[in-house]
A protein has these predicted regions:
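Histidine- and acidic-residue-rich, metal-dependent catalytic cores
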Residues: 1-196
Length: 196
């Protein structure tokens, strides 16, 4: 995973103009959709591309799409960077408030998807590892989890579900919660394969 060269960056950046060209041939495209395609790589501080727009010069739907696009890129493998755990991406996005992205939109995004969205690999305080399958709207840090590995990080003979809203303590009566998010691929687990 090496950084992109200047030539590769130039090629990647062409997708915006190429996307706009494709839209020209389509009838009935809503102007908001065209704005998203044209401006989803603009950044709140003017550091984006293709026009270095800043703040409210960037249409609101493009500002939202930029956050989503960045999140999606970071949680997935790319030729130049390995996938990052969703909780770590959320933390990174939070530091980008009022720099790359409008603070209020970042905060709404985090409220919407939660810290550990479905598909996140997590380790619990008892050492078990699983994948988040369903979030709790009321208590974001207490989702339903498909447990896959025991505390010794060995595959469970039978996977099982645990709802952290209902199960608040482990077998030793210690508080049970998410200790940390794990990078995709940790312990050889691929969340995408597990949830299909």
């Amino acid at each position: 995973t090496a950084p992109l060269s200047e030539a590769e960056i130039s090629i990647v950046r062409k997708h915006v103009s190429e996307g706009m060209e494709m839209l020209k041939g389509c009838e009935g495209v809503h102007p908001d959709v065209a704005d998203i395609v044209a401006h989803h790589h603009e950044r709140y501080n003017g550091s984006g591309y293709p026009r270095q727009l800043k703040n409210d010069q960037i249409p609101v739907f493009a500002r939202i799409a930029g956050i989503i696009d960045t999140y999606d890129a970071m949680i997935n493998d790319r030729p130049f960077a390995a996938a990052v755990a969703p909780a770590d991406v959320i933390a990174r996005l939070y530091t980008m408030r009022d720099v790359d992205f409008q603070a209020e939109l970042i905060e709404e995004f985090i409220q919407t998807i939660g810290i550990y969205p479905a598909g996140s690999l997590v380790e619990l305080t008892n050492g078990e590892v699983g994948v988040v399958v369903c979030e709790s709207r009321k208590r974001r840090l207490r989702p339903k989890i498909l447990l896959l590995l025991d505390s010794a990080k060995q595959a469970l003979k039978e996977t099982r579900y645990i709802n952290l809203l209902e199960t608040t303590h482990d077998a030793r009566d210690r508080p049970l919660e998410i200790l940390k998010g794990l990078d995709p691929g940790a312990y050889g687990l691929d969340p995408e394969e597990l949830l299909i």
